[in-house]
Amino acid sequence: MSEKSRRKHSEHEWLNKISDSLTLGAISYICFAFILGTLIIGVNVERGGVLSDWGAVFLAEVTLIAGVIHFYINHPRSFSRNGRVVLIFGLMFIHLMLISLVFSFVEGDIFGEGGERYGFLLCPLAFAPFSVSILLGRAQALFVTVLCSIWGSLLVSIDLSVPLLATNLIVGFVCVLLTDSVRKRSGLVRAGFIIGLIMLIFGLLFGFVTGSAPGEGVMDWKQFSLGCVVAILGGVVTVSVVGAILPFIENFFRITTDISWIELADLNHPLLRKMTIEAPGTYHHSLIVANLAEAAAETIGANAI
């Protein structure tokens, strides 16, 4: 074995030890529990959440423990891989931080008294569910959706906690459904538009678009138009940001998504075009075998990609 091969082999062994270390896994969960508690108690003091400061922290930590147990039982492979743990809980932390930052921004002088309404419409509720669904699959995205919905409701005031909880759950579930139909990165914009529409519908139901619930008061068309734009734009921007950071996450965590596989299968790919010229027989034979494999996978319900 050459020196280069030995160095590469030892590097892989070192990475595997880190990835499978129970000690590092436990440290990751403890760090997230501490960060989560700090984030919630800090925000709860400012905004007057639905529970007392320590009550909110207690609820967050209990749901975290329940979530970790669920994660261990239903996703043992991801649970035992520290890279996946860091990815999932890191995305959830970013999701919660974005919610907190959005409400901190809209509570300033720019938006005035209507800040909370725009904060609700601008919330990137699709961030973690959409990211995890594309990267790791639907089952783990549902897990993330439920936890982010509960924790997100603890970051806002009493008036917003239930609307945000309900909306986050529905948006997350829709994200899980939409990712199955997203085959190219360009399809992310369409998914973002659909998510924006859902945000708009819930904004109308809870009175965050017009400032009053349906049937209450006079319709303010200016507020309605602005609310529609904010809701749709929020959904499109959130999903577009997810699409922009996906290649970096895939590269860093060594994950290949369905979108990446489909892009590699593009017949205009330079390697495939070169193959059609230099080895046309092999090229056509490969296409036939690939089509047969895809049909077989679809027949047994496996992932054809």
Describe the predicted segments one by one.
Residues 51-62, 115-122, 164-165, 226-236:
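Alpha-helical transmembrane segments of polytopic membrane proteins
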Residues 112-116, 275-276:
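Active-site-adjacent structural elements in folded domains
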